[in-house]
Amino acid sequence: MANPKNTAALQELKARFEEADATVLTEYRGLSVVETTELRRALGQDVTYSVAKNTLLKLAAKEAGIEIDESLLTGPTAVAFIKGEAVDAAKAMKAFGKDHEAFVVKGGNMDGAALSAEQVMAIADLDNRETTLAKLAGALQGSLAKAAGLFNAPASQVARLAAALQEKKD
C-alpha cells in the first residue's frame, strides 16, 4: 500500500501541474533558505515554487498529461508552477541566476511542449504580453493615422479641383 503522505503529495503536485500554464524545473542545490525565499518573492504571486521528490514529479506530471524530459529529474529538483505570464517568471529566474551561481534552470514545459534550459532562458528575453500589446497598438495607431491621411488626400484633391472649376466658370 502506498504511503498516505506520498499519495497526498502526488495529488497536490498533479493539481499544480494541471492548473499551471507553464512549469520550470530547477536545481536548488547550494541555495540557502533565505535565497530560496528571495527567489519565491521575485517570482511573484502567480508562481508557486516547490521542492519535490523526482519520483513524485515524474508520476504527477504523467498523471496530469504533462510532458517532462525525464533526464531533467536528477539531483535536487524544485518546480516553478506558473499561472499566467511565463515571460515575467522566466525574467525573474534569469536575473536570480545571474546573482546566484548555484541556481540552475534545468528545463520546463509550456503549452504542452517540453522546453530545454536554453528555451526557458530565451523566453526571458521576450517582451511580456502587455508590452507586446502596447507595441502593437502603437504600430496600428501610426498605420491608421497614415491611412486616414491617404483617404483624406483624394477628397481634398477633388475639393480643390471643384473649387478651381468653379473659379474658371465664374
UniProtKB/Swiss-Prot annotation:
Lineage summary: Bacteria, Bacillati, Actinomycetota, Actinomycetes, Mycobacteriales
Coiled-coil annotated residue ranges, if any: none
Protein name per the record: Large ribosomal subunit protein uL10
RNA-binding as UniProt keyword: yes
Gene: rplJ
Complex and partners: Part of the ribosomal stalk of the 50S ribosomal subunit. The N-terminus interacts with L11 and the large rRNA to form the base of the stalk. The C-terminus forms an elongated spine to which L12 dimers bind in a sequential fashion forming a multimeric L10(L12)X complex.
Any one annotated GO CC term: ribosome
Record keywords: Ribonucleoprotein, Ribosomal protein, RNA-binding, rRNA-binding
UniProt GO BP: translation
A Pfam family recorded for this sequence: Ribosomal_L10
